[in-house]
Regions:
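Transmembrane beta-barrel strands of outer-membrane/channel proteins
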Residues: 32-34, 63-67, 83-85, 99-103, ...
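Residues that define the transmembrane beta-barrel architecture of outer-membrane proteins
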Residues: 26, 42-46, 77-81, 113-117, ...
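Repeated loop/turn-to-beta-strand initiation elements of outer-membrane beta-barrel proteins
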Residues: 26, 58-63, 94-97, 129-133, ...
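Residue-level signature of outer-membrane beta-barrel architecture
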Residues: 34-36, 52-54, 89, 123-125, ...
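Transmembrane beta-strands of outer-membrane beta-barrel pores
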Residues: 34-38, 56, 67-71, 103-107, ...
Length: 236
């Protein structure tokens, strides 16, 4: 695992180093949803997200991270961290190449971790103030560890993704993000569907539905997990 982390760190630094003379500042948003319930039953949940990006001439660098933890009556039921880095190089207003790194640690999925590095091509179908729609596909390498058997495996994967945003009103935006990694040992599918409602230039409320599916989870683990969230969003 140490070598994998070193590889990912080296790739991230190499991708970030590709720069030009004129760079826009980092822009993005942070989200937080925290619930503490006490009474006949005790439950706690924490849902944190960070998404930020920066454009440097033809380059765009993006960082995404999320953390989810939930417990009921002192018994933990969810504990997941997902982090990703992507660098895009624009060939034109619509086409781009990408290099991406992704790391996921989900305590209750049956996999101790799933880590991948990939590259490929993308296309922007819409890129307006109202609608944004882009897709991408490519190949990569993924390493995962079964937390039931303790075995680690790695193989080539096909990766695909879609990002969609639609400003249906001046204050309301619909978001859909899809990600897929398919290899011989497992196919990971994730989809986030959300609605954001602006309260001010910086603050918004976001309601989301997150679906995750592993087609070949370890024995005794379910294939599909879903999470419904309500977060406060701060844009910067």
């Amino acid at each position: 695992m140490t070598r994998t982390r070193q590889l990912f760190a080296s790739l991230a630094l190499a991708l970030a180093a590709a720069s030009g003379a004129h760079a826009d500042p980092w822009k993005g948003k942070g989200e937080a949803g925290i619930v503490f319930a006490r009474g006949n039953s005790d439950s706690d949940s924490v849902n944190l997200k960070l998404a930020m990006s920066r454009e440097i001439e033809r380059w765009k660098h993006s960082l995404d991270m999320s953390y989810l933890r939930a417990s009921s009556n002192g018994v933990e039921s969810s504990n997941r961290f997902v982090g990703g880095w992507q660098s895009d190089y624009k060939f034109s207003e619509r086409t781009f190449a990408f290099g991406a790194l992704r790391y996921e640690r989900d305590k209750y999925s049956g996999f101790d971790y799933q880590a991948s590095a990939s590259t490929g091509l993308g296309y922007k179908f819409y890129d307006t103030d109202k609608i944004k729609l882009s897709t991408q596909a490519g190949l990569g390498y993924r390493q995962l560890k079964d937390n039931v058997t303790g075995q680690t495996s790695g193989n080539l994967v096909f990766v695909a993704g879609m990002d969609y945003e639609n400003k249906v009103t001046a204050t309301t935006k619909i978001i859909d993000k899809f990600h897929a990694e398919s290899g011989s040992d497992n196919t990971l599918l994730t989809n986030y569907l959300g609605v954001e409602v602006k309260m001010s230039d910086k603050l918004a409320l976001a309601a989301g539905y997150d679906v995750r599916r592993n087609t070949k989870p370890p024995a005794g683990k379910k294939k599909t997990d879903t999470v419904t969230t309500l977060n406060l969003v701060y844009a910067f």
